[in-house]
C-alpha cells in the first residue's frame, strides 16, 4: 500500500496576484510548468504576469526575470528582460534557464553571471 501527502508549498488556492514572500503568503498569476536547478531551486514561468519566479527549497518566492505585468520582448539582464506569456522552463547543466516565450514565438535563454 502506497501512502503520500499533498500539501500547499507556495501560493494560495483562493487568491491570485503578484506577491513575493514565504510559502503560502506568496501569490501567483497563472503559474505554468516549473523546473529545478541543481541546488533545488524551482523556477516557475508566470504566464499571467510575464515573469519567471524563483522558489528556494525553503519556500521563499522572489522575482527571477521579467517585470510583473509588462509583456514584451527585451533581452538583457534578468530584471530588464521582458517576456510575453512564458509557458515552460528548463534548466540546463550550467544552470542557464531556457524559457518557452509563447506569444513572442521564441525560446529564450536566461543566464546569471
Residue ranges and their predicted role:
Residues 5-32, 60-87:
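Gly/Pro-rich loop segments of beta-rich domains
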Residues 8, 50-54, 60, 105-109:
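A short loop-to-beta-strand structural motif that recurs across blades of beta-propeller domains
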Residues 32, 53, 87, 101, ...:
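Specificity-determining residues in the recognition alpha-helix of C2H2-type zinc finger DNA-binding domains
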Residues 1-3:
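Short, small-residue-biased leader/transition segments that mark boundaries at the very start
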Residues 111-113:
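Short loop/turn segments immediately following beta-strands, especially the blade-tip
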Residues 47, 102:
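Short loop/turn segments immediately following the C-termini of beta-strands
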Residues 36-39, 91-94:
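Residue-level detector of Asp-centered blade-edge/turn motifs that repeat once per structural unit
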Residues 41-43, 96-99:
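Conserved beta-propeller blade signature
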Amino acid at each position: 500500500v502506497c501512502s503520500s501527502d499533498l500539501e500547499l508549498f507556495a501560493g494560495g488556492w483562493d487568491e491570485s496576484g503578484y506577491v513575493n514572500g514565504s510559502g503560502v503568503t506568496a501569490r501567483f498569476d497563472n503559474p505554468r510548468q516549473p523546473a529545478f536547478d541543481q541546488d533545488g531551486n524551482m523556477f516557475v514561468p508566470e504566464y499571467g504576469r510575464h515573469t519567471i519566479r524563483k522558489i528556494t527549497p525553503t519556500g521563499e518566492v522572489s522575482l527571477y526575470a521579467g517585470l510583473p505585468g509588462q509583456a514584451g520582448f527585451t533581452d538583457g539582464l534578468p530584471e530588464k528582460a521582458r517576456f510575453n506569456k512564458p509557458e515552460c522552463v528548463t534548466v540546463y547543466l550550467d544552470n542557464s534557464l531556457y524559457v518557452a516565450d509563447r506569444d513572442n514565438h521564441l525560446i529564450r535563454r536566461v543566464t546569471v553571471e
